[in-house]
């Protein structure tokens, strides 16, 4: 899969950049220092000139520190900036993957992969600028309990030299809750099938799950198990984060789903990650119609090219219903292999 190929490339960069002693280090709590709300002073390189502005960020911990999510907003030189960073930790490789998304597009960018050594974190990704291949580096440094420094740099010569184009100096604040953007438009009825399609999931839930024991094998044997989870709205509902903890017959399952709305094409992208490796799967992409959501992705399962469908119904009912199904004939027929029924425990509170 392309995701694994790219990750392997970035893994090699991170390993070359890290001392041997750092590769075996348990770094699952490296980002714990970010807990809370931050004031951020930013400098951005625009047409060879640095532009300065200010923003605010909120950090939330996931999986007891093995993942986290940052909301961020600022009034930049080109207008309002609203984004988030999802960070996930792989306990096998001891590496972090950092995924950025901007609310204008609702897409997770390719992961920056790396780790911390001596309180400094370096994370790398590959990209293209005007058709030219480049490396991108994130560096976290000067970390205390109340301050931190972040730089983004670009290299066009394979990492021999770097040019910084984004610098952030952060100071922890106790001014109160992270403020929602003041310029969000009022919600309209059509928003329920668009940017607010998942609003009803906000809060805490009990899960009753049914899993088909063997997929694409003609099986009709199912296993039932139970779990709990929480859904947190982000970007005033135009994104949200679901966390799930399940005690299954094969052991504990911890996962998350990050859902991002793309206002340009009015689709949702649903990203799943499992705590066992921290890797984010290819997104399920789709829409709501009259409260019914269908989301699709292509993947490989058991050497089959598989079309995957997520199906959401009854989101406003006391028990929202979810089904996952696979098709190996281009969507002509479907095999349902995962069913979830939810029961609300508590509404969302900030």
Question: Would you name each region that the model predicts?
Answer:
Residues 8-17:
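Bacterial N-terminal signal peptides
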């Amino acid at each position: 899969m392309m995701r694994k190929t790219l990750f392997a490339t970035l893994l090699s960069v991170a390993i070359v950049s890290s001392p041997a002693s750092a590769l075996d280090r348990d770094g699952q709590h490296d980002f714990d220092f970010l807990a809370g709300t931050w004031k951020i002073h930013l400098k951005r390189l625009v047409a060879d000139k640095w532009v300065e502005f200010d923003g605010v960020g909120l950090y939330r911990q996931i999986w007891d520190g093995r993942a986290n999510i940052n909301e961020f907003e600022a009034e930049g030189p080109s207008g309002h900036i609203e984004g988030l960073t999802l960070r996930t930790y792989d306990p096998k490789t001891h590496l972090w993957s950092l995924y950025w998304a901007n609310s204008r597009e609702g897409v997770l960018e390719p992961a920056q992969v790396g780790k911390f050594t001596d309180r400094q974190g370096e994370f790398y990704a590959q990209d293209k600028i005007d058709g030219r291949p480049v490396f991108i580096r994130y560096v976290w440094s000067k970390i205390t309990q109340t301050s931190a420094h972040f730089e983004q740099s670009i290299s066009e010569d394979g990492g021999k030299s770097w040019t910084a184009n984004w610098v952030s100096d952060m100071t922890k604040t106790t001014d109160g809750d992270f403020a929602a953007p003041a310029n969000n438009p009022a919600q309209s009825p059509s928003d329920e099938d668009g940017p607010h399609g998942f609003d009803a999931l906000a809060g805490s839930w009990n899960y009753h799950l049914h899993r088909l024991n063997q997929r694409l094998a003609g099986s009709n044997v199912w296993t039932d198990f139970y779990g709990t989870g929480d859904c947190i709205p982000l970007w005033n509902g135009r994104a949200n984060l679901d966390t799930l903890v399940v005690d299954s017959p094969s052991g504990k399952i911890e996962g998350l789903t990050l859902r991002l709305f793309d206002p340009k094409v009015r689709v949702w992208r649903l990203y799943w990650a499992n705590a066992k490796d921290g890797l984010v799967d290819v997104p399920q992409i789709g829409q709501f119609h009259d409260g019914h959501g269908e989301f699709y992705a292509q993947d490989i399962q058991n050497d089959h090219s598989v079309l995957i469908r997520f199906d959401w119904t009854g989101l406003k009912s006391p028990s929202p219903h979810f089904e996952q199904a696979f098709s190996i004939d281009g969507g002509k027929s479907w095999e349902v292999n995962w069913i979830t029924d939810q029961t609300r425990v508590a509404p969302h509170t900030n």
